[in-house]
Structures are given as C-alpha cells and as structure tokens.
A protein has these predicted regions:
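Accessory alpha-helical/coil subdomains and C-terminal extensions
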Residues: 1-65
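C-terminal non-catalytic interaction/assembly regions of soluble proteins
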Residues: 56, 61-139
C-alpha cells in the first residue's frame, strides 16, 4: 500500500528465484484445460474435453476434489496428465487409492487456476507423472 509491500506470511514452498522453471525462451506453454465438475454432470462435456487431447487436464471437483463417477470413467488413464483439484477455494486435495488406479495427480493446496499454471510449467520440464506430482508438493 502506498508503494510499500506488507508481508504477513512467509512462503514455505519453492517459488520465484528458487524455481526450476524458466519461460524466457518459450513461445507458448502446453495447453492445459480446466473442467469444472458438478453433481448430475452428463458425459458430453468431459467426453468433448478428452477428445481435444489437451496436454493436461485439471478436474475441478467438489470438496476434496471429488469427481462424479461418470467423469472418472471418461478421464481415467488418459494419454495426458490429469490433476484433481477442489472448487471450494481452500483446503488440501490429497491422494486417495483410486487416484493411482485412474492415473490422477492431486493439486495439494493449489486452486484449480494455480494448478493449471503449475502443470503448464511442469510439462515444459517432464511428462513423468511422479515428477509432475512432486512439483505439486514442492510449489
């Protein structure tokens, strides 16, 4: 305020100058789509998104990033990384046993929008799911 930065919390995660990401020489970032899920969702939208073959997908689920069963069936084990996130605005999305079976990553504490940016950056470094998941735990 008034030209002075006020800090109230210190970040415990990697960021800015500690980051492994460098976008200076990139002309474009990978295409990562956000799909917002809701109860009673029909198959048309998730099928359409998967058919576009994005570089990555963020599934914005309910509470703990919970997604409808039909969306899970459509989006599991795709050729691109898929990350579960929550639409609640805060809280953690942690891995559950079904994630490993579906090939999903989790956003940890990141919002869907921040998870999208991190996945875009992560895909400039690797397509390895374990390494991508580690980025979500570090940043």
């Amino acid at each position: 305020q008034d030209g002075v930065a006020h800090y109230y919390k210190a970040s415990t995660r990697r960021h800015t100058k500690e980051s492994v990401f460098d976008v200076h020489d990139l002309k474009e970032l990978p295409r990562v789509v956000i799909l917002t899920c809701y109860g009673g969702m029909d198959d048309m939208v998730p099928m359409s998104v998967v058919a576009t073959n994005p570089d990555g997908l963020i599934l914005t689920g309910l509470g703990h990033g919970t997604i409808p069963q039909n969306v899970r069936q459509i989006t599991q084990n795709t050729a691109f990384p898929t990350v579960r996130a929550s639409r609640t605005g805060s809280g953690m999305v942690s891995a559950v046993p079904q994630d490993a079976l579906a090939g999903y990553l989790v956003s940890d504490t990141l919002s869907p929008q921040k998870a999208r940016i991190l996945l875009m950056l992560g895909l400039t470094k690797t397509k390895n799911l374990k390494k991508l998941q580690q980025f979500f735990y570090e940043y």
